[in-house]
Structures are given as C-alpha cells and as structure tokens.
Amino acid sequence: MAKILVLYYSSWGHMEAMAMAAARGAGEAGANVTIKRVPELVPEEVARKAHYKLEQEAQIATPLELADYDGFIFGVSTRYGMMSSQLKNFLDQTGPLWAAGKLVNKPATVMVSTATQHGGAEIALASTQLALQHHGMIIVPLSYAYQGQSGNDTVRGGAPYGMTTTSDTDGSRMPSAQELEGARFQGKRLAEITAKLVR
C-alpha cells in the first residue's frame, strides 16, 4: 500500500479544504494517507489580527520525515505569484534529503490557492514543481483528464499543471464543489500512479 503525504500551507482554510479533498481521493485509490501542514512563520499576534486559521486539525510536519513516504500532494498558498514563504522555508530545510537522494523517483503533485483569478496560480504551480524536480521527484500533473476545469460559465479553478482555487482578496470565497472535486481527482490520480511505481 502506497504511503502518501498531503502537505500543505493554509492561512485561512482554503488550501486546508483542498488538501482534505485530495486526501479523500488518494484514500479512494487505496493509499495510506497522512495529512500534515508546514509551520506558520507569521507572528501569532499578527496572524490573529489578520484572522488566520491557526487551529487546524493537521499536525505539523518536519522536513526529514518526507523520506518516509512514497508520494506527495503539495497544497500551496501563493504570495505575490510565488509559493508562500512558509512552504519555501520548509522545502529549504530538505537539503539532507536532496544530498542523500531520498526523494528521487517519488511522485508528487501540486495544488495552488490564490486570492484572484490572475494571482499567479500557474507560475506558483510551475515554480513549486521546479523545487521538487531538484529532488528528482516525478511530477504528476492534474492534466486535462479532469474535465471539470473546462468552461467559463463561472469562476473555475484548475490548470493542466495542477488544481487551483481562488479565495478573493478578503478570503470570503471558499473552494467550490468543482474545485474540491478537482482536488479529489488529483489526489486519486497521484495515488494510483504512486501505487504502480512502488510495486
């Protein structure tokens, strides 16, 4: 049974919801799924004033534990079109894993949350994937196999590179049913591909 880590950062709960949906999908594919988050870097007083969701069910991950998993689903909140500093800081601490080749040939997929439709989702997906490629990880995209991303009748997350969601600048828009379904689809796809590689 493939061991999948869903690792995310979420300020207001949007990516937390996407991570839970992706975990459900991975579980449907028969994977042993663990959901964890990266540590918050914003001082607590500042985070509380900004109404961050500081109490989240997922435990805090440590960088070196990534070696224990077969595949990964990364949930990324963006800042100015890039991955958040919280996830970047976490990945910057994985140097020992890189030096030992511990993540080589392990599948990974990425989802992104932005405040606006044009807030850099595709750039954040690509730049996060670049960091994972330095580890030799195998990138598993959402792809157009998930047809729910097509159409322009409403605000609709998704890109061939990974699932996306838009929160609005005040955080008032939570992931839609279509976006949560896309996250579930992406999680299941990652788990199915991982299972084929760990046989």
UniProtKB/Swiss-Prot annotation:
One of its GO terms (molecular function) is NAD binding. Belongs to the WrbA family. This is NAD(P)H dehydrogenase (quinone). FMN binds at residues 10-15, 78-80, 113-119, 134. Binds 1 FMN per monomer. Its EC number is 1.6.5.2. It comes from Chelativorans sp. (strain BNC1). It is an enzyme of class 1 (oxidoreductase). One of its GO terms (cellular component) is membrane. InterPro entries: Flavodoxin/NO_synth, Flavoprotein-like_sf, Flavoprotein_WrbA-like, FMN_Rdtase-like_dom, NQO.
